[in-house]
Amino acid sequence: MTEVVPSSALSEVSLRLLCHDDIDTVKHLCGDWFPIEYPDSWYRDITSNKKFFSLAATYRGAIVGMIVAEIKNRTKIHKEDGDILASSFSVDTQVAYILSLGVVKEFRKHGIGSLLLESLKDHISTTAQDHCKAIYLHVLTTNNTAINFYENRDFRQHHYLPYYYSIRGVLKDGFTYVLYINGGHPPWTILDYIQHLGSALANLSPCSIPHRIYRQAHSLLCSFLPWSSISSKGGIEYSRTM
């Protein structure tokens, strides 16, 4: 497709689910967009299997973009991404995995990728409601265009995956990117626990614990977090009448 795309193209874009008749077109598009070769069974699955959310963006009848995602229980997350969610979430908590998101070159920077991503979020809110806590994906470390796209939409790098991809016999590194939704979050780190302790101390009334113990805990915390907002200069004031 080499036609000049008008700036108003997004207003003419329609969305529909992929179907079996789209297989040849989708194969051609994925060959242009991605360096990975997918088996024929993959194309059959994403165009026919209802477990996939496979949405096409069309312009004047032609597919110019698509997103393929799967909403699944957290127990089905592959081992390398098993810590996307904190262990406190129940086993029936769901996540959404983006298998593919692409837009025809001439139609990029027209908002079509964002439209497809927002449509996935709408689908999640309708089907999984608040049971889905994260949307995640994998991307080549060298794919700066995709990385910038996701980072600009609040996805954050979660893992570095060395030798994750095999492309024409050559091993390539990847990243896992995650967008947390509906209160989802990763496991806490040591820094998270320290910051939580700092917040808890900041909310305590000094009169509720012995003055001396409070001062010792406060000093210890500040030694870990010199930037802490509960410093004695700008934080809690002590009463001299305690």
From Swiss-Prot:
Pfam families: Acetyltransf_1. Residues 13-182 form the N-acetyltransferase domain. It catalyses: N-terminal L-methionyl-[transmembrane protein] + acetyl-CoA = N-terminal N(alpha)-acetyl-L-methionyl-[transmembrane protein] + CoA + H(+); L-lysyl-[protein] + acetyl-CoA = N(6)-acetyl-L-lysyl-[protein] + CoA + H(+). Residues 1-192, 237-242 are cytoplasmic. Transmembrane segments: none annotated. InterPro entries: Acyl_CoA_acyltransferase, GNAT_dom, NAA60-like. Acetylated: autoacetylation is required for optimal acetyltransferase activity. Substrate binds at residues 38, 99, 165. Residues 162-173 are annotated as: Required for homodimerization. Acetyl-CoA binds at residues 101-103, 109-114, 143, 150-153. It is an enzyme of class 2 (transferase). The active site is at 97, 138. It is found in: Golgi apparatus membrane. It comes from the Eukaryota. GO terms for biological process: cell population proliferation; chromosome segregation; N-terminal peptidyl-methionine acetylation; N-terminal protein amino acid acetylation; nucleosome assembly. Residues 193-236 dip into the membrane without crossing it. The keyword GTP-binding does not apply. One of its GO terms (cellular component) is Golgi membrane. It is a peripheral membrane protein. PANTHER family: N-ALPHA-ACETYLTRANSFERASE 60. N-alpha-acetyltransferase that specifically mediates the acetylation of N-terminal residues of the transmembrane proteins, with a strong preference for N-termini facing the cytosol. Displays N-terminal acetyltransferase activity towards a range of N-terminal sequences including those starting with Met-Lys, Met-Val, Met-Ala and Met-Met. Required for normal chromosomal segregation during anaphase. May also show histone acetyltransferase activity; such results are however unclear in vivo and would require additional experimental evidences. Belongs to the acetyltransferase family. NAA60 subfamily. This is N-alpha-acetyltransferase 60. It comes from Rattus norvegicus (Rat).
